Swiss-Prot record:
It comes from the Viruses. The lineage of its organism: Viruses, Duplodnaviria, Heunggongvirae, Peploviricota, Herviviricetes. It is found in: Virion tegument. Its main location: virion. InterPro entries: US22-like (IPR003360). The keyword Nuclease does not apply. The gene is US24. This is Tegument protein US24. Keywords: Virion, Virion tegument. Belongs to the herpesviridae US22 family.
Length: 501
């Protein structure tokens, strides 16, 4: 990946990027990042035409604008080069409607001051950032050739930044961050138990693993950024699934039909990782999402209350899955890519973000009186309306510094939102989903010592060396290890397509 800080200006002269801005310290005002985004994008917010955005980028080339949380994410303004031009052409083909996409530059991650040196003050990413109508922000991945909708408007960008986008949790980004910064050990609450989830087969010679906070037994916490924490019960076999609801209600014929459909969709040997849901005292565990892995380590989920029971990808690797949880299921329909690629990866189909714009444009024509007003007067009136909207976004009383946005202060809105992307708030009550009750029960079992390692491995390896590599490394703590072998792939005929379960 090229260095976005280097390059030439519009006149061929070398561009010297300005000094990188200092990142705020962690203990400062929690609303500082929100206000920083509003300040950085103020001039872009008032741009009425794509050409105005382009001129702004030319004037401020090399400047970094904050993209909100997670802290450190910025867009470095750059005029069009070969990579940006190619990304713009590809993104224009992926967008569902004829929306003008104006490139802003490359997404970068600025490192905190103590971790910077003289040469590596930032981490370059493969994402090109675009701005559409009504301050919509998109990011195009130049490696995997897809685009995500980062935010629908400036308010959403300032509140949530890129935390709702899968691009913030990719392994390639976090691997680079670990290489360029001093490793910081992940901190768990005092006395917390941990569970290591290991994935190892012929496709991953070195293996990969993730660490989760264990509650009790094989129950771990799965956190989805911007949504909340749910209980995930790790499973080893389909027989274990038959002990929980609704799988315990399936007949033998229905069970075979279920697993046949999973095989037909994944088209590889596959593993059961577990289910998310809630325990019920004296009754079966209620499964809400079934989580699977294919032979290559990609993670898929099946939403149990969806009558179609589609198999959908939620992460490329197990490490990404425990980093972002069910983010792609909660904030879904934001990924734009070629249809063949979407079907191959089994991604959610995007939803058009423009379906309300026709009505909005009609109201704008009425508001600005296009037929009667002169063009200059119309633009002046439009800028005046935008100024009023921007002033409203900057009102400090809209937020509580400890609770966040105002909807969290209204008791009438403290409800459980599940996979509702139309809502601006996602309040996940830990008591409703059973996390608090499970933690209280775990507190009474301080003597619980295992299991500590959940393995998704091929114990029946085709080579003796492979079997010894897996078994020997873990045999000394076999009492604390659970295994999950892959389900074999039976030969299937016909075209691979989505098969309803």
């Amino acid at each position: 990946m090229m260095d976005p800080a280097a390059g030439s200006g519009p006149d061929g002269a070398a561009v010297v990027p300005p000094e990188l801005p200092a990142l705020p310290v962690a203990a400062e005002d929690p609303m500082a990042l929100y206000r920083q985004v509003l300040r950085d994008f103020k001039e872009l917010f008032f741009c009425l035409e794509p050409m105005e955005i382009t001129r702004y980028v030319h004037r401020n080339e090399g400047r970094c604008l904050s993209l909100g949380p997670p802290k450190g994410w910025h867009v470095m303004l750059r005029t069009e080069d070969g990579i940006i031009t190619a990304a713009k052409q590809a993104a224009s083909k992926l967008i569902c409607c004829r929306e003008p996409l104006t490139p802003l530059g490359y997404a970068v991650i600025l490192l905190p001051e103590p971790r910077r040196d003289h040469h590596d003050g930032m981490v370059a990413t493969p994402y090109v950032v675009f701005m559409g109508r009504f301050s919509r922000v998109y990011a195009y991945d130049t490696r995997e050739k897809y685009m995500v909708l980062v935010s629908h408007n400036l308010d959403e960008l300032a509140r949530y930044g890129v935390s709702r986008s899968e691009i913030a949790y990719r392994d390639v980004i976090h691997t680079t961050l670990r290489r360029m910064t001093v490793p910081v050990p992940r901190r768990y609450p005092k006395g917390a138990r941990t569970m290591h989830v290991l994935f190892l087969n012929d496709t991953t010679p070195e293996g990969s693993y993730a660490t989760a906070e264990r509650i009790l037994g094989c129950d771990v916490k799965l956190h989805t950024p911007g949504y909340g924490t749910v209980i995930m019960r790790l499973m080893k076999t389909v027989q274990q699934l038959h002990r929980i609801w609704p799988f315990c209600a399936l007949t033998e014929v229905e069970s075979r039909r279920w697993w046949w459909a999973v095989r037909a969709n994944l088209a590889t040997p596959w593993y059961v990782l577990g289910v998310t849901g809630r325990p019920r005292p004296g009754r079966s565990f209620v499964a809400e999402v079934l989580v699977l892995l294919d032979w290559f380590g990609a993670v898929y989920a099946i939403q149990m209350d969806d009558p179609n029971h589609y198999v959908r990808r939620v992460a490329n690797t197990i490490t990404e899955f425990f980093r972002m949880g069910l983010l792609k299921m909660v904030f879904r329909h934001r990924r734009f890519e070629r249809e063949r690629q979407r079907q191959t990866r089994m991604e959610h189909r995007h939803l058009c973000p423009h379906h309300h714009e026709r009505a909005v444009d009609h109201k704008r024509d009425i508001l600005f009186n296009e037929d009667a007003a002169l063009p200059d007067e119309r633009r002046e009136r439009e800028r005046r309306i935008l100024q009023q909207q921007y002033d409203w976004l900057c009102l400090t009383e809209r937020f509580d510094p400890h609770e966040g946005a105002w909807e969290r202060l209204d008791p009438n809105t403290l409800v459980l939102h599940r996979y509702d992307t139309n809502s601006q708030s996602y309040v996940l009550d830990p008591d409703i989903v059973g996390v608090e009750a499970a933690e209280r029960e775990a507190a009474g079992h301080q003597d619980d010592t295992g299991p500590r390692l959940h393995c998704l491995v091929t114990t029946r390896s085709s080579t003796r060396e492979g079997a010894e590599r897996v078994i020997t490394a873990l045999v000394h703590q076999s009492r604390l290890v659970t295994y999950s072998d892959p389900f074999p792939l039976k030969s299937l005929t016909g075209v691979r397509e989505y098969i309803q379960i």
